A protein has these predicted regions:
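C-terminal extensions
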Residues: 1-10, 14-83
């Protein structure tokens, strides 16, 4: 089930796991080196409107989590990825 793999990412629950699935990602490793701003813009198009900007911050955190092998604990908190 897609929820399990994505839910290993800090800040990602069932709803955001579904968003990632709808964007075409099938595993956490698929997020490596992706562009969070592009992910957010594409999801806004899929959903038919602007989404809460906090989702962008979670995407930034998720890409960091997937792309790096050693993690700074502060950067695993999505709210630390605000503009």
């Amino acid at each position: 089930m897609y929820h399990k793999d994505f839910q290993r990412i800090p800040g990602v629950g069932k709803s955001i796991a579904r968003d990632l699935w709808d964007l075409g990602y099938r595993s956490t490793s698929d997020l490596r080196c992706q562009d969070p701003e592009d992910m957010y813009a594409r999801l806004c198009l899929i959903r038919g409107g602007r989404l809460d900007r906090c989702l962008l911050y979670v995407f930034r955190c998720a890409v960091y989590f997937a792309s790096e092998t050693a993690h700074d604990p502060d950067l695993l908190k999505w709210w630390n990825w605000k503009d």
